[in-house]
Amino acid sequence: MAYVRLFDNPEGTQEQYDAASERLGVTAETMPEGGVLHVAGPSPTGGWRVVEVWESEDAARKFDEETLLPLLQSVGVERPEAQTWPVHNLVVR
């Protein structure tokens, strides 16, 4: 079952996001295994927001443990807690 994660980082900045993204090197062609969708931008309440859709919770957890968390630590960003929920419907053009 597909799985959504929403990260709201009140102290997050575009510069931090761009630094982490550059090191990850993820594009539509290199999306991590199990990744479906990744969207990021400024939060309406300030800071930075990221929304991800994964094929499963296990795929997201594997990416976190093996790739994302070590990278965020290396650029000095603490990963905020995620709001998560199962996907009922996903429409992509």
Task: Briefly describe each language-model feature range.
Residues 1-66, 70, 76-93:
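Short S/T/G/P-rich N-terminal loop/turn motif that feeds into the first structured element of a domain
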